[in-house]
Design a protein with these regions (language model features):
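Conserved alpha-helix/loop element of class I SAM-dependent methyltransferases that forms part
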Residues: 27, 44-62
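Class I SAM-dependent methyltransferase SAM/SAH-binding core
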Residues: 65-69, 73-123
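A short SAM/SAH-binding and catalytic strip from SAM-dependent methyltransferases
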Residues: 133-145
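Conserved Class I S-adenosyl-L-methionine
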Residues: 210-269
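A short acidic, Gly/Pro-enriched loop at the edge of an enzyme's catalytic core
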Residues: 122-133
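Short, glycine-/aromatic-enriched active-site segment of Class I SAM-dependent methyltransferases
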Residues: 168-188
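A short glycine-rich, Lys/Arg-flanked "PGG" loop and its adjoining helix->strand segment in the class I
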Residues: 147-162
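N-terminal auxiliary segments of SAM/dcSAM-dependent transferases
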Residues: 1-24
Length: 269
């Protein structure tokens, strides 16, 4: 866990975010929109596009209370709150990311709809049946105990509540390229194959409504040599060290079939 905490550490994240906003021509003293921040705060494969696609599938409504697991800087949470008017609880392990999320919630005026909790996805600080929907993007790859993870998600969902997710899963060959966006080395890389993921989800009380592999679609829509954000542009490099190498390794792993990208929507029985 110490390695994982270091991987997601971002010292002075609030100052770094504010400096990056000003360098990009945005005034933190004025109300920002979630779209202004999209290049910065959707820290998962496919970025804002992937979040919007998952939103179309998730069947979340304005009256719902939603849990965002491994929320990072809460970009998807702000997207949900702004687009639907729903209330979102963010659960994030990294204290640095929690601080950054709270700052950006204030700057977008969405802090009245989004709450940020620091904690573990394996021991969630919420009562049973607390949420109408759960949301998770590129988080399970860091968690070895999938049964406990999915069991906790099921516990905090109301009966019939939906769980929408996007994850990397193991491909046909071992993952060999490190560092990756989610793991500095193999010690924090806990990919499972699709068959195991679906089996554990079913055993945890979920009924599958949608499950699909989006690897090829993602690769076809993402340029292999996509340039990193230029100076003065917002991007993940504000808080992710060595981003170009990590992203390159992730793409190479996907191209060679070492990993696959999947998404799904399930219902809690």
């Amino acid at each position: 866990m110490a390695g994982l905490e270091a991987h997601y550490s971002a010292r002075d994240i609030e100052a770094r975010i504010l400096a990056a906003l000003r360098a990009a021509g945005l005034n933190p003293e004025q109300r920002l929109s979630p779209e202004d921040l999209a290049a910065l705060d959707h820290f998962h494969t496919g970025g804002l596009r992937a979040s919007r696609e998952l939103l179309e599938l998730a069947q979340i409504r304005s009256e719902h209370r939603v849990l965002d697991i491994g929320a990072g800087l809460a970009g998807p949470a702000r997207m949900l709150a702004a687009a639907l008017g729903c209330r979102v609880a963010c659960l994030e392990m990294s204290p640095d990311y929690c601080a950054g999320a709270a700052l950006l919630n204030r700057l977008t005026g969405l802090d009245d709809r989004i709450e940020v909790h620091q904690g573990s996805a394996l021991d969630m600080p919420f009562a049973d049946d607390s949420f109408d929907a759960a949301w998770m993007q590129n988080v399970g790859m860091n968690i070895a105990d999938k049964r406990r993870l999915y069991g906790e998600i099921h516990r905090v969902l109301k009966p019939g509540g939906r769980f929408a997710f996007q994850e990397m899963v193991a491909g046909k060959a071992a993952t060999t390229y490190f560092p990756l966006p989610w793991a500095t080395d193999p010690a924090d890389n806990f990919l499972v194959c699709v068959e195991e993921m679906r089996s554990v989800l079913e055993g945890s009380g979920f009924i599958e409504e949608l499950f699909e592999d989006t690897s090829d679609a993602h690769l076809s829509r993402t340029a292999a040599n996509a340039a990193p954000a230029a100076p003065g542009q917002l991007g993940l490099a504000v808080f992710v060290d060595n981003l170009a190498r990590k992203a390159g390794n992730a793409r190479r792993s996907l191209e060679e079939g070492q990993v696959r990208l999947v998404r799904g929507v399930l219902r809690a029985s």
